[in-house]
Amino acid sequence: MRRSKQGAEGKAEKKAARSAGVCRTTLPGGLRVVTEHLPAVRSASVGVWVGVGSRDEGATVAGAAHFLEHLLFKSTSTRTAMDIAQAIDAVGGELNAFTAKEHTCYYAHVLDSDLELAVDLVADVVLNGRCAVDDVELERDVVLEEIAMRDDDPEDALGDMFLAALFGDHPVGRPVIGTMESVSAMTRTQLHSFHVRRYTPERMVVAVAGNVDHDEMVALVREHFGSRLIRGRQSAPPRKSTGRINGGPALTLGKRDAEQTHVLLGVRTPGRSWEHRWALSVLHTALGGGLSSRLFQEIRETRGLAYSVYSALDIFADSGALSVYAACLPGRFADVMQVISEVLASVAGDGITEAECRIAKGSLRGGIILGLEDSNSWMSRLGRSELNYGKYRGIEHTLQQIDEVTVEQVNALAHQLLNKRYGAAVLGPYASKKTLPRQLRIMVN
């Protein structure tokens, strides 16, 4: 019966597409398997990427994707949490997971000889996590401790405040981890329903990189995922677009007994499929992405006003955020904001130079290549590419896109984005509207 069943499934299976060492197969039900053969390594990394994150949650279950990620490791129908831990420890591997705004990833990194165990463990956790009542209560306490720890970290807390200021009541603006209130109120039924409704095969990608064979990998996935994934899964509900955001960018203030004042300000950007995506990355890098960037040089190296200052770029499917962060002594806050506003105004008006554009492009290229030093990095690139674009975008394609960026494109983009109204968050001992520097008040109004 098993052999006959596999034969029937094989007829519906889409033939593997092969490109430069990368192979792709779509199984019945829509589950995609993407592999990259890296013959020079003795390791293998397996990741199950689920196209579900915190932006897919309703307000009453904020933090459900992250809570569920924790919970699925507690027990399955055949393994306890200790069984799972001992199985991966016995081969010297790594088994972990993380949740983001738009996806959740469960992954294992092992020797190539232990690949089947890795697939078995990850599949068991993702598909058969029990969501038992006792486990829910135990892990709830762990997540609440994690929220408290995040709230104690000024940069983490500020990041959540900033996205809320920029995206308002849209799910993108809520913390991935949830809040004390939402996690405390979440029920086992809600978490189980989230698992069943959101973890559907068409939203899943199994990405594998290392010393692996594609056909063998597909066979392993069919064996360990198989009918357990295909049967009994409803179609996933649609994702809420960021086009429906109530209100414009705002200002959020948080008072905290600390030595420094922290500020994060920025603007909304288009999403990852935007034709100027890499010009945006060049702009971010030139602004505050490196040691030679405008902000770092002007605020830290030239004036010594702050130790930590940088820009950041968050890109989602249909929107994003270009932001600037700085932390300084409260007495220097006005001076720091003066320099930030001058740098942003200068780049918005006059743009960056050819030399700055060249350095930023080189920084991006080098960072991408250096970031692919192990099988885990290649696996992550495979999974993200398939989940975000529905196809493999090789490193050569990305590097070519960066090379094609011109300084004229970057400067047109700077003029378009940096003249917009800013959203901002301020956290510190004297954070109030009365004490805000004039430059910041102008930028957020």
From Swiss-Prot:
Region span, Disordered: 232-251
Species name: Mycobacterium leprae (strain TN)
Molecular function terms from GO: metal ion binding; metalloendopeptidase activity
Cofactor(s) recorded in Swiss-Prot or TrEMBL: Zn(2+)
Gene3D superfamilies xrefs: Metalloenzyme, LuxS/M16 peptidase-like (3.30.830.10)
Note accompanying the cofactor annotation: Binds 1 zinc ion per subunit.
Zinc keyword on record: yes
Active site: 69 (proton acceptor)
Designated name of the protein: Uncharacterized zinc protease ML0855
Binding site for Zn(2+): 66, 70, 146
InterPro entries documented for this protein: Metalloenz_LuxS/M16, MPP/UQCRC_Complex, Pept_M16_N, Pept_M16_Zn_BS, Peptidase_M16_C
One GO BP: proteolysis
Keyword field: Hydrolase, Metal-binding, Metalloprotease, Protease, Zinc
